[in-house]
Curated annotation (Swiss-Prot):
Cofactor remark: Binds 1 Fe cation per subunit.
EC number annotated for this UniProt entry: 4.4.1.21
GO biological process, one term: quorum sensing
Family indicated by similarity: Belongs to the LuxS family.
Enzyme class: lyase
GO molecular function annotations of the record: iron ion binding; S-ribosylhomocysteine lyase activity
Protein name: S-ribosylhomocysteine lyase
Cofactor(s) of this protein: Fe cation
Subunit-structure text: Homodimer.
Reactions catalysed, as given in the entry: S-(5-deoxy-D-ribos-5-yl)-L-homocysteine = (S)-4,5-dihydroxypentane-2,3-dione + L-homocysteine
InterPro entries from the UniProt entry: LuxS_sf, Metalloenz_LuxS/M16, S-ribosylhomocysteinase
HAMAP family: LuxS
Length: 158
C-alpha cells in the first residue's frame, strides 16, 4: 500500500492549534499545489462535533476565499480535529495561519450570522440539517484563545 503522509505524522508530538505545510507538488504542466494541515484541536484529546465542524467548513470556504486567492479546497479530517487546505501556488504556514486567524475572528464575531453561512439549504448541501452556528462560533473562540501556531511541534503563535 502507498504511504500516506498524514499517517506518518506522530500525532502524539504535535501541539494544536497550528498550521503545518504538508508539502507542495508540481503537476505535469508546471502548476504547483500546496497542501496544509490546519489542526484546530489536539489529536486524541478532543474532537469538534460534526454539526459545528460542518458549519466551520461551509463558513471557512467563503471566508478564506475573501482573504486569499487560489484556495482549491478546505476539507475536514475524518478525525474531526482540523482540515486539509489545498492551495494553488506556494504559500507559507505563516501566510495561511494569518488567513485562518482572520477568518475565525470574523466567524466568531457577533455580526456573523446564519445569513453569512453559505450552502445551508437542502438544495445546496447533502446534510443541511447537520449544522451548528453556535458550535462553530464557540470552537472558533476557543481556537483563537489558544492561538494558532506556525509550527506543529513548538508554539510559535501568530
Amino acid at each position: 500500500m502507498a504511504e500516506v503522509e498524514s499517517f506518518q505524522l506522530d500525532h502524539t508530538k504535535v501541539l494544536a492549534p497550528y498550521v503545518r505545510l504538508i508539502g507542495s507538488e508540481t503537476g505535469p504542466k508546471g502548476d504547483v499545489i500546496t497542501n496544509f494541515d490546519v489542526r484546530f484541536v489536539q489529536p486524541n484529546a478532543n474532537a469538534i462535533g460534526m454539526a459545528a465542524l460542518h458549519t466551520i467548513e461551509h463558513s471557512m470556504a467563503s471566508l478564506i476565499r475573501d482573504r486569499i486567492d487560489g484556495m482549491i479546497d478546505f476539507s475536514p479530517f475524518g478525525c474531526q480535529t482540523g482540515f486539509h487546505m489545498i492551495m494553488w501556488g506556494e504559500h507559507s504556514s505563516e501566510e495561511i495561519a494569518k488567513v485562518i486567524k482572520s477568518s475565525l475572528e470574523e466567524l466568531s464575531s457577533d455580526e456573523f450570522g446564519w445569513d453569512n453561512v453559505p450552502g445551508v439549504a437542502e438544495k445546496e448541501c447533502g446534510n443541511y440539517r447537520n449544522h451548528s452556528l453556535f458550535g462553530a462560533k464557540e470552537w472558533s473562540k476557543k481556537i483563537l484563545a489558544e492561538g494558532i501556531s506556525t509550527d506543529p511541534y513548538e508554539r510559535k503563535v501568530i
